[in-house]
Amino acid sequence: MENHPQIRLVAGLGNPGSEYMATRHNIGFMVVDQLAAQFGSTWEKSVPQAREDALSAKCGAVLLIKPMSFMNRSGYPLFAVAQFYKIEPQQILIILDDLALPLGRLRLRARGGPGGHNGLESIIVQFGTEEIPRLRVGIGQAPREGYVDYVLSRFFDEEKPLVRSTIGRAVDALKCAIDNGLVSAMNTFNKTETEEA
């Protein structure tokens, strides 16, 4: 684990289109947008000849990706981009929303199953491995019924300050993983506020 490969690609998951902008399910897009903005990067089509759309931006030597194929098909464009740039699954860091985590909580993992997330499941199926690092961003627990409506809803006004600070911490976690390695980022950002106190 200490010798985890250098991260070369960071992919934020979400749904394209203005109707999905700023929804809970699109927190992955929000995080990579913030990271791209910090580096003054602009989004452009990543692999012109690819059949599946994705937008890309540069963050130093790291490629940022937003799959434009809708969440449940995220694996197709991401796999095409990784093949084009010869990037291994262990060199990719996925950012996704997580219903099981409280709003504001981050959880970095080097591997694992999809945990009920269709976007991550699509990626695992396309790459044929669960050895893909991921940063799960808590969006709060949905009501027992209607979780689809919940993940496609926008954050409440009273949640927005916490959402902004969470996006900032997620960007810091990504930069730490890129600069210092995945293990260092996990040790720093997987702690809860009570553990840090």
Language-model features, listed with the residues they occupy:
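Short glycine-enriched, charge-decorated loop/helix-capping segments at active-site entrances
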Residues: R107-G113, L152-F155
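The feature captures the short pre-catalytic strand/loop hairpin that immediately precedes
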Residues: R144-R154
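Nucleotide and nucleotide-moiety/phosphate-recognizing core
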Residues: M1-R111, E121-L135, A142-G146, P161-E196
